[in-house]
């Protein structure tokens, strides 16, 4: 109902609809333009410190109406083939370290990475947010989610496949939430075509790391098997990795 109401307030031909259509047609460029903004904010945080940065940006927010900055604002991020190779190298390094330390559990978790020729395959579509935004400056986590996901998949013996022209792709949630349902469906169709090709017509499972995105994908894409991380790990990786129970709260989104 909310989407229908918003659709009525943003009819075709309106300025808001034209803006949404422009973003959809130039999505890769829009995402690329966001990364320097995040990098600039991170640079300002590094130079000014948290307290000064908070004071200055709060004043700018009150006067100019710019989005409110917080210390949790992420750095910029981009998925590249280099990061995919880096994840492989990290897994290989961990395997070598585990061998020297005779840590059999960690070795089991990583030993299958080297079997590239016989590896299972998975199509990984990181959400638009995770393609563009990394970690906050003072995050206790060492790696962005995409890097962690790639590393985990490779430790489980999976070859990771990204869909072609991934920077241009989106499930359409952004436009659906604004009532631009036709644009949302168009973006979903583009994504489906790219995933269909990458998965070799549904031969390989498709993984998306953001539950709202996966929810819409499941509503619009019927001919492929789609998974979120916890579900994929439970279905495909639980017998291939060694898990160590942690004594702390864990949030599953």
Residue ranges and their predicted role:
Residues 2-253:
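Iron-sulfur cluster-binding electron-transfer modules in prokaryotic oxidoreductases
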